[in-house]
Swiss-Prot record:
Record flagged with keyword Membrane: yes
Lineage: Eukaryota, Fungi, Dikarya, Ascomycota, Pezizomycotina
Keyword annotations: ER-Golgi transport, Membrane, Protein transport, Transport
GO process annotations (BP): autophagy; intracellular protein transport; SNARE complex disassembly; vacuole fusion, non-autophagic; vesicle fusion with Golgi apparatus
GO cellular component, one term: SNARE complex
Family, similarity comment: Belongs to the SNAP family.
Metal-binding listed as a keyword: no
Entries under InterPro entries matching the protein: NSF_attach, TPR-like_helical_dom_sf
Protein name: Probable vesicular-fusion protein sec17 homolog
Membrane topology: Peripheral membrane protein
Localization (cell): Membrane
GO molecular function, a single term: soluble NSF attachment protein activity
Role: Required for vesicular transport between the endoplasmic reticulum and the Golgi apparatus.
């Protein structure tokens, strides 16, 4: 028969109260605090079995509080807060990002930036997916990418720079997106395993350039990409950018749509590209309104 998690929680509360009232002779007080923390963790896991995730998170937080304030065990506290993050993630994402931040600070204070980066990435995912908070997701992904980069984990950093670029573009910050796409493209040019993806990064950077409505800069950027990777000029992605630049420069919406339709038949446009292309299309309509 499964143990009632509320009974375990009450036992933890009683043990904690007993420790707080005791005199601490012969180390008894510290043992009681440790027992209380262990009981809270047992209660948390029992709540998890019942899928009572919010209650589980609260018990993990109580254990972390004891580890921090009574036992002076910051690593144990960080582990408890990570467990709280996991159970809060779906049901209480605001609590999840708060709890994991405590663990992240502990790892950075200890100089363990690789581990901190991994959990900062997890926090960013919650901001992006559960909380739908693009600005905070961008900030968290950026921090994680910087920590990975400083730790020499270039591939992990680049994966997150691409997330920053994607989200920045969807948030309307096309210049920031261009910068990050170009950064990853440059890093990938000298890597045989990553080189195939360069055309995708240049395409995305080029689309963001077109979305800024600055056709002079867009022309310069597209030319720059061809110079950095001459093989890019033989790719469909390059030809699409050239065609869309011509259409945008001449405010030719029909050409824009025809070239997109032709490309889409060969290489299906994903949701991100569709969103940025919609912004470019809207720029055509704004130009029409200015001259009407």
């Amino acid at each position: 028969m499964a143990v009632d998690p509320r009974v375990l929680q009450q036992e933890a509360e009683k043990t904690l109260a007993s420790a707080s009232k005791g005199w601490g002779l012969f180390g008894n007080k510290e043992d009681k605090y440790q027992n209380a923390a262990d009981q809270y963790i047992q209660a948390a896991n029992a709540f998890r079995l019942q899928k009572s995730n919010t209650e589980a998170g609260k018990c993990f937080e109580e254990a972390a509080k004891i580890f921090t304030e009574k036992l002076k065990e910051p690593n144990d506290a960080a582990n408890a807060m990570l467990d709280a993050f996991k159970v809060y993630r779906k049901d209480a994402p605001d609590n999840a990002v708060r709890c994991v931040e405590v663990a992240i600070k502990q790892y950075t204070m200890a100089g363990n930036f690789r581990r901190a980066a991994s959990h900062k990435e997890n926090q960013a995912e919650v901001y992006e997916n559960e909380l739908q908070n693009k600005p905070e997701a961008i900030k968290a992904y950026t921090t994680a990418a910087e920590w990975y980069e400083n730790d020499g984990a270039v591939a992990l950093a680049n994966k997150l720079w691409l997330k920053v670029a994607d989200l920045s573009a969807l948030a309307g910050d096309f210049f920031a997106a261009i910068e990050k796409f170009e950064k990853v493209a440059e890093a990938s040019l000298g890597n045989n395993l990553m080189r195939y993806s360069v055309k995708e990064y240049f395409l995305k950077a080029g689309l963001c350039s077109l979305a800024t409505k600055d056709m002079v800069t867009a022309q310069r950027n597209i030319t720059k990409y061809a110079e950095k990777d001459p093989s890019f000029t033989g790719q469909r992605e390059y030809q699409l950018l050239v065609d869309l630049l011509e259409a945008a420069s001449n405010n030719n919406l029909e050409m824009f749509q025809d070239k997109l339709a032709a490309y889409d038949k060969m290489s299906r446009l994903d949701d991100w590209k569709a969103a940025v292309l919609l912004q470019i299309k809207n720029n055509f309509e704004e130009a029409d309104n200015e001259f009407s």
